[in-house]
């Protein structure tokens, strides 16, 4: 990972335009990881936007930064221009460009820096920088690890911690799946120390008026 971190540091140091995108029908891990990265980059004074292929579930509207998400299917021209004009595109919680729907038509791996951050198996080789680890519990956990490796852990505040916790919780069945280990709980300890409200996050997801079902271990 050290070589990938060095390459990523080089890209971020140039302060270029950045777009972050997710798979279609973004879930808790996709929204949590993309907004955690978005809020982190904003604290670094980077020019960054989050664009999702389509609308996320209403019960995720409370997530910090959610009001700044640009939904591609609602404004294809505007969102497409942002993606076309971005120097670097982060693709979160998926590992094949087909999974981001029509957004992929605006992405050019030959002229743009593509950065994959994902924890699913069998990634396709489309990104210049690939943070891909199926042994990690969630993409949110991987975002935390990358932030730590970049020396940005000190920038993680309550809002960013909330986003990270959201994805870790939803993609692990509230920390019941086999991907959860000691390292996962060390990260949870850090997030709790940032003041996140575990019960509030849980209630917003599982006790909302809209039923949310955590992905199975195979579909995380």
Task: Tell what function each PLM region has.
Residues 212-220:
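Single conserved hydrophobic/aromatic residue that forms the stacking wall/gate
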